[in-house]
């Protein structure tokens, strides 16, 4: 059985939306992502509505959002999430009502990258420096990179 989830990467300049299909075996596939400029939308809710219209008016009842900034901890999101270079405000307590979803997940954008790295196959990596070895099955994964600021995440 496939489950569909709206996945969103929200930064200071862009919000990228896609539909992820998750197979019974855990395999994830994405449809073609759509990039919306945050400056073109007064709020995340209006960007969501624009994406929903592009998808024919119906979206899955679950959303997973990777957000550029602090989101709180699992099960205890920040009551108000603000962006550095984007006037949007997300209030997790209102997500289900405002977006018409039944479930949501919030994660920092670089934490999302760290989770993706943990699932990646060795063939998806490009060796740049240091020992040329496959990623270990255990241990800490660190991800660092530029975005609106300098993003860092560790996955244990």
Residue ranges and their predicted role:
Residues 2-50, 54, 77-79:
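Short glycine-rich, Thr/Ser-proximal phosphate-binding strand/loop in the N-terminal lobe
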Residues 12-14, 110-115, 148-150:
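Conserved A3 ("GATE") glycine/threonine-rich loop of ANL adenylate-forming enzymes
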Residues 15-19, 142-144, 149-156:
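Short beta-strand scaffold segments in enzyme catalytic cores
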Residues 10, 132-138, 143-146:
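Solvent-exposed alpha-helices and their adjacent loops that cap or buttress functional pockets
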Residues 1, 56-59, 135-137:
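Flexible, charged surface loops at secondary-structure boundaries
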Residues 55-106, 111-124, 143:
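Short beta-strand-loop/turn "lid" adjacent to the catalytic site in phosphate-handling enzymes
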